[in-house]
């Protein structure tokens, strides 16, 4: 491989090796090798179509690039920091493959639009993989919710028992979060599906190129309509990192509850041994390490977002070398998101729900206090007065260790003769859940309707991606 830099004509001195190493990005942007070759193939075919390059030259370049593409698939390409980045490494390898005619490939193109094209292609390929993983997670959520429609558990506010809910209702809350994540990534894909190829360095080119043609060859839906914007834009990457951060936040919240609920104090759920680890010193331990790791990995994704935001905030138009720092965080985030989703989905699919423990937790926790207040309000007592009455009953019950459903009817009627035997029906946790049939509520009928809606949405995605 040549040690002569492809841009070296203007220079009389060579840089020191440590300077070359500092400026080189090939250690990480080699991940874009397939996209770089694909972009070059589309570009040179466009040069042939427009008559900018002779057909014979183009055919030779195409053959060389196709050879490199095959070698890349086999992992046979060797790169050098002397050639800095993936673009110049590929061109150098092409020169070795076909000779000086390879130098014509860069006609009407700059590394500025080249790297932007590579990055667009990379995320364009990765986003559907993330969407598929999210769809798999949503499917498991819906399946698990379908199995637990009538599994009653405490609902929490401030991590205090608040009102009884269905475990399925809890799971479907996360389904809605992940559904919004999917919608954000789908919108992100639209912003990624735009070709910057042909913008050249920043001002376009004097050659009669056909940008729409090269965009079509690469599968892009449209092209950038401002060459400065085309080479300067990293909004699509920031949007991806932002969406990924929100997704990881959702996973982290879920993992926090998995960690807590699998503890001895809660015992609401039990994790499969496949997704747990032990202790090197304490034989009894079964640690929720995978949930903790996913929770922890949210921080590195946040860091990747803040890193690129900080890089971008001070960059004038158009390209600046700072933009070399846009890739490692994005690459890391793609890997982190894909692996986190894969592990989390398996963990959720295999966890066991302790229905009896969840139900027991609603028995003596006074989470039916709102039911009693509503009962009194329905009997004509103003809600604020009912709220105060029930608050005093709860305080008394805490002192006597007596839940609301154990208060004798005679004692209730001393508060109001309107209270009848049916009050005990309303104080039952399962009944309390079932009666919350307002739209979006935790009532069993509402949950079944939401499950049906979710299954329709999942089927629609499946149909769209298989057509």
From Swiss-Prot:
Disulfide bonds: none annotated. GO terms for biological process: arginine biosynthetic process via ornithine; L-arginine biosynthetic process. Pathway: Amino-acid biosynthesis; L-arginine biosynthesis; L-arginine from L-ornithine and carbamoyl phosphate: step 3/3. It holds the Pfam family Lyase_1. One of its GO terms (molecular function) is argininosuccinate lyase activity. GO terms for cellular component: cytosol. It catalyses: 2-(N(omega)-L-arginino)succinate = fumarate + L-arginine. Keywords: Amino-acid biosynthesis, Arginine biosynthesis, Cytoplasm, Lyase. Transmembrane segments: none annotated. Its EC number is 4.3.2.1. Belongs to the lyase 1 family. Argininosuccinate lyase subfamily. NCBIfam families: argH (TIGR00838). This is Argininosuccinate lyase. It comes from Lactiplantibacillus plantarum (strain ATCC BAA-793 / NCIMB 8826 / WCFS1) (Lactobacillus plantarum). The lineage of its organism: Bacteria, Bacillati, Bacillota, Bacilli, Lactobacillales.
């Amino acid at each position: 491989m040549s040690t002569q830099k492809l841009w070296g004509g203007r220079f009389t001195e060579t840089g020191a090796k440590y300077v070359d190493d500092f400026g080189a990005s090939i250690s990480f942007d080699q991940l874009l090798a397939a996209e770089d070759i694909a972009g070059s193939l589309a570009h040179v075919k466009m040069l042939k179509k427009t008559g900018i390059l002779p057909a014979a030259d183009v055919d030779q370049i195409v053959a060389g690039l196709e050879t490199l593409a095959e070698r890349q698939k086999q992992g046979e390409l060797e790169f050098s920091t002397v050639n800095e980045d993936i673009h110049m490494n590929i061109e150098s390898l092409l020169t070795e493959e076909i000779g000086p005619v390879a130098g014509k490939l860069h006609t009407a193109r700059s590394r500025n639009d080249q790297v932007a094209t590579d990055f667009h292609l990379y995320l364009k390929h990765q986003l559907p993989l993330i969407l598929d993983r999210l769809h798999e997670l949503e499917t498991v959520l819906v399946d698990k919710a379908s199995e637990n429609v009538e599994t009653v558990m405490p609902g929490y506010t401030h991590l205090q028992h608040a009102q009884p809910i269905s475990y399925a209702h809890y799971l479907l809350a996360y389904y809605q979060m992940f559904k919004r994540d999917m919608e954000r990534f789908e919108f992100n894909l639209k912003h990624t599906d735009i070709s910057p190829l042909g913008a050249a360095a920043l001002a376009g080119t004097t050659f009669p190129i056909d940008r729409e043609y090269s965009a079509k060859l690469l599968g892009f839906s449209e092209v950038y309509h401002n060459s400065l914007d085309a080479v300067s834009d990293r909004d699509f990457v920031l949007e991806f990192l932002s969406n990924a951060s929100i997704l990881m936040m959702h996973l982290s919240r879920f993992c926090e509850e998995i960690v807590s609920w699998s503890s001895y104090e809660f015992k609401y759920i039990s994790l499969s041994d496949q997704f747990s680890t032990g202790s090197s010193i304490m034989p009894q331990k079964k640690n929720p390490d995978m949930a903790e790791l996913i929770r922890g990995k949210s921080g590195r994704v946040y860091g990747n977002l803040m890193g690129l935001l900080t890089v971008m905030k001070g960059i004038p138009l158009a390209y600046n070398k700072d933009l070399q720092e846009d890739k490692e965080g994005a690459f890391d985030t793609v890997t982190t998101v894909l692996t986190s989703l894969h592990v989390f989905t398996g963990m959720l699919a295999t966890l066991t729900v302790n229905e009896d423990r969840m139900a027991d937790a609603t028995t003596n926790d006074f989470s039916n206090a709102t039911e009693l207040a509503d009962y009194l309000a329905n009997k004509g007592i103003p809600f604020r007065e009912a709220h105060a009455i029930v608050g005093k009953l709860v305080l008394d019950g805490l002192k006597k260790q007596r839940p609301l459903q154990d208060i004798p009817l005679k004692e209730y009627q001393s508060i109001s003769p309107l209270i009848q035997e049916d009050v005990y029906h309303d104080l039952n946790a399962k009944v309390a859940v079932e009666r919350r049939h307002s739209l979006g509520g935790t009532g069993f009928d509402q949950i079944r309707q939401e499950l049906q809606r979710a299954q329709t949405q999942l089927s629609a995605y499946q149909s769209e991606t298989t057509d």
